Amino acid sequence: MAVVKVKPTSPGRRAVVKVVHSHLHKGKPEASLLEPQIQNAGRNNNGHITIRHKGGGHKHHYRVVDFKRNKDGIPAKVERIEYDPNRTAHIALVCYADGERRYIIAPRGLEVGATILSGSEAPIKAGNTLPIRNIPVGSTMHCVELLAGKGAQIARSAGTSVTLLARESTYAQVRLRSGEVRRIHIECRATIGEVSNEEHNLRQYGKAGAIRWKGVRPTVRGVAMNPVDHPHGGGEGRTGEGQVPVSPWNTMTKGYRTRSNKRTQTFIVSRRKK
């Protein structure tokens, strides 16, 4: 890994900071693990915008990543580490002893030629997946399940991880990167180590066009709109909101908690730190 600041040959290049990964695969991805990805620009079947600030961007296929890691007892060899345009983390192409190939989230320090294993008997090593009941307290984990057998849902982005704090008879307590402490069933699976590409936050795009390549459209301030478009809109000249900051649909937008899932509220031991 190397952080490179390019020469300021133009205003768009002046602020660019690249993170160069020389170990990534230079060729094409595994064709059997690709799926077409239809771009809908944040619109639903009626053509209405349901997700703002999405549209355009470079075409790419979806890489089918194995988040369940359910091939127990079968060792897999890492063939290569690849870039994935759909996520911030790198992915690893592994080949199991029975010949099947799968993509997994590459943990930090995983190298080509290494062997990984899944199951309750797997050793405590980066890249191995075990039930939480078999992981020592204090271990660093990623790709953690919330429901046993559903697949990893927590700590999947670049550089993230969770820490196993305690383990009870049925549930274990883990601390997330946000500071939240959560109870998770001990039969849920997790992968040892932290996610790769921890230098992702060092990258500087340098110009708006680089963000457009990723399919992100501009975010317009409400005070710059007309009254028909936003509650903050209108006025003669430059004006403030004149009220509590709200969203385009007139719900409070700063400090207003939007969590409504009461069913899983009991699994949160302490809320995240602001």
From Swiss-Prot:
Lineage: superkingdom: Bacteria
Region named Disordered: 224-274
SUPFAM superfamilies: Nucleic acid-binding proteins, Translation proteins SH3-like domain
MF terms (GO), sorted A to Z: rRNA binding; structural constituent of ribosome; transferase activity
SMART domains from the UniProt entry: Ribosomal_L2, Ribosomal_L2_C
GO biological process, one term: cytoplasmic translation
One Pfam family here: Ribosomal_L2_C
InterPro entries: NA-bd_OB-fold, Rib_uL2_dom2, Ribosomal_uL2, Ribosomal_uL2_bac/org-type, Ribosomal_uL2_C, Ribosomal_uL2_CS, Ribosomal_uL2_dom3, Ribosomal_uL2_RNA-bd_dom
Chain intervals with Basic and acidic residues compositional bias: 229-239
CC annotations in GO: large ribosomal subunit
Keywords assigned by UniProt, alphabetized: Ribonucleoprotein, Ribosomal protein, RNA-binding, rRNA-binding
Function as written in the Swiss-Prot or TrEMBL entry: One of the primary rRNA binding proteins. Required for association of the 30S and 50S subunits to form the 70S ribosome, for tRNA binding and peptide bond formation. It has been suggested to have peptidyltransferase activity; this is somewhat controversial. Makes several contacts with the 16S rRNA in the 70S ribosome.
Family: Belongs to the universal ribosomal protein uL2 family.
Annotated NCBIfam families: rplB_bact (TIGR01171)
PANTHER family linked: LARGE RIBOSOMAL SUBUNIT PROTEIN UL2M, RIBOSOMAL PROTEIN L2
Record note on quaternary structure: Part of the 50S ribosomal subunit. Forms a bridge to the 30S subunit in the 70S ribosome.
Protein name: Large ribosomal subunit protein uL2
